[in-house]
């Protein structure tokens, strides 16, 4: 397994036997048709390094997209929360649809990295962190890695009206990633 850390100087790879600085960008990795092969090639003769004490989120120019209502318990909770607004049947249509509920979450400059605080909306009374398995998908649609994510949600805003989802989910520092891409 290779762990990739990002810092102000670029990428650091940690394998079972070494820690090295890579001559590689995350953008190049995400654009590669075979990120694993590119990474293994760049590991050869790479200079030694140390794991950063203050890393960055493992993304460069990539957008974060998320999938909503991914399990039954989530659907049930959302239905209950939006019942007063008449939105309880809305989630039946989302959960049973052919197309998944995908939504835009953040651009890189709006993402909290390791050790950085996420933010909450001032106009919300019920803000919830949602731990996520975050997939790294290259430009050809191949999953080549994963990291830990945090998807902050203003549940009272979403519950008021399901169409308020962007307001409940998309704001500065509403997402966090890292510390490493595996």
Briefly describe each language-model feature range:
Residues 37-182:
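Active-site microenvironments in enzyme catalytic cores
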